[in-house]
Amino acid sequence: MRSLVLLSSVLALVAPSKGAFTWLGTNEAGAEFGEGSYPGELGTEYIWPDLGTIGTLRNEGMNIFRVAFSMERLVPDSLAGPVADEYFQDLVETVNGITALGAYAVLDPHNYGRYYGNIITSTDDFAAFWTILATEFASNELVIFDTNNEYHTMDQSLVLNLNQAAIDAIRASGATSQYIFAEGNSWTGAWTWVDVNDNMKALTDPQDKLIYEMHQYLDSDGSGTNTACVSSTIGSERVTAATNWLRENGKLGVLGEFAGANNQVCKDAVADLLEYLEENSDVWLGALWWAAGPWWGDYMFNMEPTSGIAYQEYSEILQPYFVGSQ
C-alpha cells in the first residue's frame, strides 16, 4: 500500500466497469460464535477464520471477505475500551492476512446494534468504539468498516444516528481512504429497505465512499434458515425495489449476505440474483456469500474449502461473477 505499484493495483481493484462487480466474496464466521459466552475460550466457544482456506478462495477469484467478530470480546468492559489484547491482535492478524493477499477485509461487528444484549443507545460510545478500530487500520486501504451487523427492532432515528456517528468517528480517526458499509434496521433486508430504511439516505460521508449494505435470503420468510427457496426468480424480485431506491437517491449498495441451499430451485434463484445485481452494477458493487468458516460442518450454506457443501455445489455458479472473470 505504500508504493505506486501497489497503489495502482488497488485502484484497479476498485474501479468498476459497466456490467462487472467491484467485489465478490464471502463472509468468514467463527469469531462471533459462542454468543453469550463471554469472553469465551478460543477453540472452544469461538474460532478465527483460517487464512489458508481464505487463500484458496482468493486464488479462485474471491476478492472480499467479511470478518465477523464480537464487540463483547473485543471491548469487554465498555464500548470505549480498552481492548482485550489477545482477541484484538487475533483480529488484526486475520484482517492483515486477508489484505496481504490483495483482497478486501470487511470489519463486521456482528452485534445487531446491541452490546451484551442491550440496544446501543449512546452515539458517543459507538463513536468511541469505531475510533479504536479505525485508528488501528487507518493506513490499510483494503479494510472496509461495516458499522454493525443487522440492526433490528430499533428506533429508526437511532439506527440512522448510530451509522452517522460511526462514519464521523472513522473519518476523524484519519481513516479517509477506506469504504464504509452502512447497515439498516429490520435485519438490513433488501426486500424491506424502501419501507423501513428510507431515512438512511440522509447519511453523509465527507470522503464519498459510503456503501449501503443490505442482506437478502431467498426462503419464504427471508431468514435464510430454510432449505427451500420461494422460486427461481425470487432473488431478482426481492432486490428490485432496493435497486430503484439506490439509483433514485444516487447511492451505491452491496449485498453483504446471500445464500441458497443445495437444490435446483435455490441454485437457479442464486444465479438469477447475481445476474440481476451484475446487470445493475451501476448501483450494486458486489455481493458476499453467507458463509465460510472452520466450524460450519454440515451447515447448508457452508462455503469453507474444500468440504463445505456450498463450496462444492455453488463455486461453479459464483465463478463467472468473480472480479476479472467477466
From Swiss-Prot:
Compartments where found: Secreted
Gene name of this polypeptide: eglA
Listed SUPFAM superfamilies: (Trans)glycosidases (SSF51445)
Temperature dependence comment: Optimum temperature is 57 degrees Celsius.
Protein name: Endo-beta-1,4-glucanase A
The protein's role, per its UniProt record: Has endoglucanase activity on substrates containing beta-1,4 glycosidic bonds, like in carboxymethylcellulose (CMC), hydroxyethylcellulose (HEC) and beta-glucan. Involved in the degradation of complex natural cellulosic substrates.
Reaction(s) the record says it catalyses: Endohydrolysis of (1->4)-beta-D-glucosidic linkages in cellulose, lichenin and cereal beta-D-glucans
Segment forming the signal sequence: 1-19
Principal subcellular localization: secreted
